[in-house]
Amino acid sequence: MVAFGKKLKERSIQEWQGYYINYKLMKKKVKQYSRQLEGGNLERRHVLKDFSRMLDNQIEKIALFMLEQQGLLASRLQTLRGSHDALQEQPDISHMSYLKEEYRAVGQDLLKLLFFVEMNAIGIRKILKKFDKRFGYRFTNYYVKTRANHPYSELQQVFRHVGLGAVVGAVSRNLHELQNNQGSYLSIYDQPVLPLQDPVVDSIRAAVDRLTRSTNFLHFMAQHALIMQEELPSPQDEEGEEEDGRYHFMSLLLNLVNTFLYMVNTYIIVPTADDYSMSLGAAATVCGVVIGAMAVAQLFSSVYFSAWSNRSYFKPLIFSSIVLFIGNLLYALAFDFNSIAVLLIGRLFCGLGSARAVNRRYISDCVPLKIRMQASAGFVSASALGMACGPALAGLLQIRFKIYKLTFNQDTLPGWVMAVAWLIYLVWLAISFREPAREPEEIPKTSEESNHSAVQDVNLEKGMKQPLLLTSEEIEEQGEDECDGSEEASEDSRTPANSILAAYRLLTPSVKVQLLIYFMLKYAMEILLSESSVITTYYFGWSTSSVAIFLFCLGLTVLPVNLVVGSYISNMFEDRQILLVSEIMVCVGILLSFHVVVPYTVPQYVCSGLIMFVSAEVLEGVNLSLLSRVMSSRLSRGTYNGGLLSTEAGTIARVIADATITVAGFFGRNMLLNVTLLPSLVICVLSIVATCFTYNSLY
């Protein structure tokens, strides 16, 4: 892993070198502070004051240069505006082409400025993170709170690129006008065939979205998948050709279908799980164990599927389909065997076939960057659609008949239908999936060996390129670079974590809080969904069809809610603000769900459940967005990646929630609702408190 300081130097725009954050100087000062504090020669108060002043100066330098460049771009646009107006009066094809090229040139310079701002924003985040890590302070919280919220904030100039929006709008609008030839031609027959989009405008929009982390609907949906991108921007997509060679549309489609079918498989039994349990001689609340058995097995399957995807995508998907076919077959046959054990084994098999880790990994590794966001949004949409279709399908399977000794009814038909679905999918997979080409495998090294080797390689390469005799200044600079590289290799190495323990060590307080929030929302949602059939039957006498319709309606809210949040709300408020409000709304939904004194009514249950579910859906998107932002880049690849950690946190929450339902059954059905909601309330309050403590580090 090349140190960030080196990457900053390599990727920076040469003529603007003096205006970038002096990352090397800031790192040197952090080391100096550390030595002085250890020697007792410096007070902590002086360190904070001096470092704040240095960082303020660096940000001021960046912000003022941004304003200067914006002024130059605005001046050029103003000049072009006059030529554009003249063109409207006297149309001229050659002059129009000239204007388009001039606007594109401004667009290219605007791209350079956006790239400049993004590199500096990353540098500021990294130096703040390094300072906190070195001294154990919560300096980032203090600095962001005092600077970002100030009315004359220069920090906001960098992180919110204040003023650049007008330049982006002017370039885009004028190019669009010229491209659509408004007033430029006397006759429609003279109009050539022009592309609908200009590449420069597309590049500018992509750069702005990346810089602001703007969450339009597509981006907001994609964040649910927690498929992390490279942190450092690059003017060109260096991996584009390689990714295009590995990408295969039908293989991507098969991964998305796998995601959809698995979510259908998860939720298709929810409306009838209590009835199935009672028909086999168990209590209705054993439905918690039946539903949760799949999640228990998924705890283990997520790990081995994630590891397996390092070597192949096709074989894990084949194995997943076979295991899910067997699991659903056992689930369906449990009725005729009159065995709760066979039922549970069937659900365990279904959990062992969870290939969501493979689906995520395929999108992350094989889908080209230009369509990865669409693929990630497709992954989330497939999950949401499966979640809605599962209960709806169960509501349609209200028939009963026998073929020989096999019983087909509302309890067993979900198993039979899913077994047939997985069998068809298996055949399609075997025919259409194409295994992507892989790079030659390297002998794995320990992180210590990798870091040492990386530093040695850098030193050797530099030794071959540099002259034999160096000046004392050059020697000192080289020594600092080597030290920086060594530190970056040990602290910010991009080598993937090679164990759960190694991954856990990479979790900062902010990441731990986000994982706690993810645990909380999955726990609350699982309680709501899994006990819905028992609660509604006890209080309201609902039939299986009524429960299925209720769950189907909940599932249908996912996409519209994300559309509203992703397209509007997230563009008006910061992610951390939406996060905190969503947590509070989940807490409100939980409180409204309690059965206290008044008779429990359908409106109370439906409204409180809707508030809880919708708020949790909004919370999930924002939570995973922030999680991908604050998580170490070492967790973006490998077996023990961020996606696996979030999946495990959510799965553990589901397991505990389903176990809670079964245990609460011993208190009687009249106590089930309140007993299961109490842990949800406690965890939700804890997550709100934890969010408040880490609020200023979520940026």
Swiss-Prot record:
It is found in: Membrane. The keyword Membrane applies. InterPro entries: MFS, MFS_Domain-Containing_Protein, MFS_trans_sf, SPX_dom, SPXM_SPX_plant. GO terms for cellular component: membrane. Its main location: membrane. Keywords: Membrane, Transmembrane, Transmembrane helix. Residues 475-490 have a biased composition (Acidic residues). Residues 2-145 form the SPX domain. It is a multi-pass membrane protein. This is SPX domain-containing membrane protein At4g22990. It comes from Arabidopsis thaliana.
